[in-house]
A protein has these predicted regions:
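Context-gated lysine
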Residues: 3-6, 19, 51, 58, ...
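Intrinsically disordered, low-complexity regions
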Residues: 33-36, 57, 97-100, 110, ...
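Glycine-rich, aromatic-bearing surface loops/beta-hairpins
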Residues: 122-199
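Long, low-complexity intrinsically disordered regions
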Residues: 62-130
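Intrinsically disordered, low-complexity segments enriched in small/polar residues
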Residues: 14, 23, 110, 120, ...
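Acidic surface patches and DE-rich sequence motifs
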Residues: 20, 103, 135
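Short N-terminal edge-element motif at the start of the domain
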Residues: 1-62
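Amphipathic alpha-helical interaction segments
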Residues: 47, 69, 105-106, 180, ...
């Protein structure tokens, strides 16, 4: 299948088929100008008659970035799927808030990651602090659940993260491994197991 050109990814609330590997596809929706939602739905190929309501489908994560960052693995627009109309996620990981605190405190603040709630989803500077300094032991739930607002580097990291999620059931990629290096796969497996058992 032909890949989309950059200019094709310009319609708000359009749904796209994305290719993760040669035999693994998923769905992404373009929301609110620069937002892209990735869903917990995967298949070896896509049948246009497949009935999917994204309002009833789990959102794995939301990214905000320019459309051309995804042009290499967006395959085509899908019109048979019901688009998601739920509110866009407002809570994200913020790995750079500590820099502001470092300036305010004269430079003696160690690096850490915060969680923030965006008060204006269209302006990256408008947010309030939810948890200023995430602790890898006490805040594993928040660390696992939320993601960074933007995307650094190529979309290959998302390919890899989604592919590994299908294989392992754990949604964890290079970005979080860098931000939280002491969180092991064993910790994540135990967390997923505990979460599943509590349902």
């Amino acid at each position: 299948m032909l890949k989309l050109k950059k200019d094709f990814i310009d319609t708000i609330d359009s749904v796209y088929l994305i290719k993760i590997t040669d035999d693994l596809y998923s769905i992404c929706e373009h929301r609110g100008n620069t937002f892209f939602e990735f869903f917990d739905v995967f298949f070896p190929d896509f049948n246009e008659e497949r009935k999917i309501d994204l309002n009833e489908t789990k959102i794995l994560f939301t990214k905000s970035c320019a459309a051309d960052r995804f042009k290499d693995f967006f395959v085509k627009e899908i019109t048979s799927v019901i688009p998601n109309s739920r509110a866009i996620e407002t809570i994200y990981l913020q790995p750079f808030y500590y820099l502001l605190k470092r300036l305010q405190n004269g430079g003696d603040v160690n690096q850490y990651v915060s969680s923030v709630k965006r008060t204006n989803i269209y302006k990256s500077v408008d947010y309030e602090i939810v948890i200023e300094q995430l602790n890898e032991q006490n805040n594993l739930q928040e660390i696992y659940k939320y993601n960074s607002f933007g995307m650094v580097g190529s979309a290959d990291k998302i390919h890899e993260e989604l592919s590994n999620y299908v294989k392992t059931g754990i949604l964890w990629g290079r970005e979080k491994s860098t931000l939280f290096p002491t969180i092991s796969m064993e910790m994540l497996q135990n967390y997923i197991l505990q979460t599943t058992n509590s349902l």
